Amino acid sequence: MSQMENSTKKVESVANVEVVTTENAKVEQKPTSPADAIQLKVNANSTIKNLKTLVSIVKLTESGAHIGLNPKKWNPKMASYIHAKRSNNHVIDILKTILFLDRAYKFLQEVSQNGGTVMFVGTRGRVVKELIKAEAERTNSFYVTQRWLGGTLTNFTNISRSLKKFNSNLALLESEEINKYSKKEQIAINKETAKLEKFYGGIKNMKQRPDVLILVDPVNDVNAIKEARKLNIPVIALANTNADPQLIDYIIPVNNYSVKSITLILGVLADSIAELHGEPTKIVGRPDSEIVLPETKSNWKQNNYDPSKRGYNPKYVNHKSTFNKFNNKKPVDSTTNEIKTNVIKAETK
C-alpha cells in the first residue's frame, strides 16, 4: 500500500469548513457541498456511521449548527468540541453534535419510559421562548420562559404555595363565585393572576420537581443549572463555544444563537418523548423536504422605520423619498419649497 493512499487529506467545503478524513482508496472523492464534505468523514467513522439518523447533516449545515462564536468569547473548556477557527468565528465539530445529540435522545427516551418529567428552560429571545413553549406543550412537559426565579427547584415548598394560589385564582375566575366579589376585588384578582401566569404558567401543573432539565442557553440560565446540580437533576443543554461543559451532564455542542439550529435540536429532543408515546414526530424520521426551518429576518432595516414613532431620525434614511412614503406624500423638490415660501412671504407683506 503506497504512502499516498494512507496519507491524510484535507477536504475544503463551500462554507469555509475544513474537514479532515483518511482515504484508503485510490480514487479521490471530491465533495460538492459542505454536507458532502462532512459525509466523507462520517463514512470513515464507524461510531458515527452506526448511529440512528435523527437529523441529516444537510439540515444541520443549512441551519448553521456548526457556526460558533467569536474566539474572544470562547471558553477554553470547549476546546475539544471545536473543529477549527474560520474568519471571526470558531467552527463547532458537527460530528460531535450528531454523536452527543444521539446520546441525549436515548437518555430522554429512558426517562420517559420510566415516567419521568421534563422541563424546558429558555429565557432569551421572544422567538426562542415561543419555540420552547410549543415543544413543551407538544410533549406535555413543563417550561420556563421568563426570568428564572431563585428557588424554583431548591425551594420547591415555597414555589408550591405560589402554584396553589395561581390554580386557585384560575378556578375562581372560571366559576360563578367571582361575581360575589366587588369590581375592585375582581380587578385585583385578575392582576395577581396575570402576574402569576407570567412566571408560573408553564409549571402550574407541576406536583414535584422535574427529572430532567433541557436548556437552550446554559450561560444565560446558569442559575437553573446550579439548582439542578444541587439536587442531582440531570441537565441537557445546547452549548455554544462560550459554555462550561463541566456544568452540563448531557452536552450538545451546537450554535444556540441560531433560531434554525435551535428549532432542529429542540425538535429532535421533543421527538424522543413524542415518539415514545406514539405521537407524530416533526424532525426524526422525516425527509428534509418536510422539515421547515423558520425564516430569519435582519434586525436592522432602515426603510422599515416609521417617522411617526418616537426616536425616528431622518438622517439615517438612505433616500429622501422614504420619509415621504410613510406620510403618503410624493417627493417634492427643495427648490419648489423655496419658491413657495418666498411667495407666501411676499403676500404677507
Curated annotation (Swiss-Prot):
Matches recorded under Gene3D superfamilies: Glucose-6-phosphate isomerase like protein, domain 1, Helix hairpin bin
Superkingdom of source: Bacteria
A Gene Ontology molecular function term of the record: structural constituent of ribosome
Signal peptide positions on this chain: none
Cellular component, GO, one term: cytosolic small ribosomal subunit
Region named Disordered: 302-334
Biological processes per GO annotation: translation
Tagged with keyword Ribosomal protein: yes
Alphabetical UniProt keywords: Ribonucleoprotein, Ribosomal protein
Protein name stated in the entry: Small ribosomal subunit protein uS2
Native source species: Ureaplasma parvum serovar 3 (strain ATCC 700970)
Gene: rpsB
